[in-house]
Amino acid sequence: LAGSSAASDVYKRQTLTILLGTIYPIIIEVLYNKRISVGGPYFNSTVIPIMIPGFLLMSIAPILSWQTNKINNSKKYVLAFIILSVLVLIQSYFLDFNTWGFVGLLLGFWIILASIIAIFSSYKIKINIKFFKIINPHVAHIGVGIAIVGITCSSVFQNELDFNLNEGDKFNVNGKTVLFEKIETTNEINFQSLRGKFLFDIEKNQSKEIEAGKNYYPVSKMITSEAGILHQWNKDIYFILGDQKNNEWFVKVLINPFVSFIWLGVIIMMYSGLIAVSRR
C-alpha cells in the first residue's frame, strides 16, 4: 500500500542516517588514523528532518482506510484537527511561543487524538483480550504521541536558572523556596567528593533533600559532575553545582517539563510490542 510503503521508506532512511553517524568515526579512524566524534549537531540536523515526515505519516495512519488509502470520516477529523490546532496555539503562546514547540505539540497531540478517535469509531467497545489485540497498533501510536509531547516540552520549553549562593542562602525555583543548606567534602579511596545539599520547598514540613556535587580524581586529574534530580510527575528539576568564586558557589538549575511523558510513552510502546509478539 502507498501509505505503508512511504512510511517504510522514511524509517529506512532514518535507520541508515543513524547508522552512518555511528560508524563514520570508526571508518575514519581505520582509514586515516584520526579520531573524530559525531554528536548532537549531526543527529539534530539530519535525523529530525527525516523523523518529521515519518511522524506526519503516523499522524494520518489511524484515519486511513488500508483497503483504499482514503481518509474515513474526513470532516470529523478536519474539525478535530482545527480545534486541536487552536488549543495548541493558545497553549504555546502561554508557554513562550516557539515554532518547533508548536509543531511538536500539535504533532504529538494529533497522533494521540486521531488514534483515540479511530479506536472509538472503528470498533465496538467490548473490553476483552481480543479488543486489546485489535486496537494494539493504535495504542502504539498513542505511546509515540505521548513521547513526542514529552520530548518537545522537555527540550523546547526547558527553563534555566543561575544563582551565586553562600551556604544558608534561600532562592526561588518555580515558585518554591529552596535552601542551599551546606557544602560537604569527603575523601574516598581514589577520589575527593564535594557535595552541595539543598532543601526543596522548605515552607512545607516535608521538604525534599537534594544533593549535587563533583568528584575529583587526583590520578587522572579529572573532575566529574553529578546533578541532583528532583522527579515530579510534570517536570524534572536538575541542580548542578559549579565552582566557587568570591566565597560564593555557582549553582545552575534546569527545569525540564514533562520528562515523565517520555517514559510513559516508551512504556506504552513496550506494552504494545509485547501484545504484538504474543499474537504470534
Placement of each model-derived feature along the sequence:
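Accessory, solvent-exposed terminal regions and/or long lumenal/extracellular loops of proteins
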Residues: 85, 136, 145-280
